[in-house]
Amino acid sequence: MYAIIETGGKQFRVEEGCKIFVEKLAADAGSEIAIDKVLMLGGDKFAVGAPYVENAKVTAEVIEHGRGEKVITFRKWRRNDSRKKQGHRQDYTALKIKTITA
């Protein structure tokens, strides 16, 4: 059984036991969270939400918080001897999917 969930403005296809990286959540490492924004359920209990599936829930365990790879932005102005280099690392939360209930 799988589900498509929405968190942090993005959609993820999850199954029980899989590990996903989502935008940073305000939860401690080792705690469990419940995600009720389930857009679709697949498998035996197929259901499509409008926009969310009623009484569907995905529980996940917070594994860790971290920062992603550095993304470099570079801008150069020609003939001015001017340039701008900037780096960014996005915060993330690693989740392990425990159960999918419908």
UniProtKB/Swiss-Prot annotation:
Keyword Aminoacyl-tRNA synthetase belongs to the record: no
MF term (GO), any: rRNA binding
Pfam families on file: Ribosomal_L21p
Keywords recorded for this protein, A-Z: Ribonucleoprotein, Ribosomal protein, RNA-binding, rRNA-binding
A GO biological process held by the record: translation
Entry annotated with the keyword Zinc-finger: no
UniProt xrefs under SUPFAM superfamilies: L21p-like (SSF141091)
GO cellular component, one term: ribosome
Superkingdom, taxonomy of origin: Bacteria
Cited InterPro entries: bL21-like, bL21-like_sf, Ribosomal_bL21
Protein family: Belongs to the bacterial ribosomal protein bL21 family.
PANTHER family hit by this protein: 50S RIBOSOMAL PROTEIN L21 (PTHR21349), LARGE RIBOSOMAL SUBUNIT PROTEIN BL21M (PTHR21349:SF0)
Biological function: This protein binds to 23S rRNA in the presence of protein L20.
Subunit structure: Part of the 50S ribosomal subunit. Contacts protein L20.
Descriptive protein name: Large ribosomal subunit protein bL21
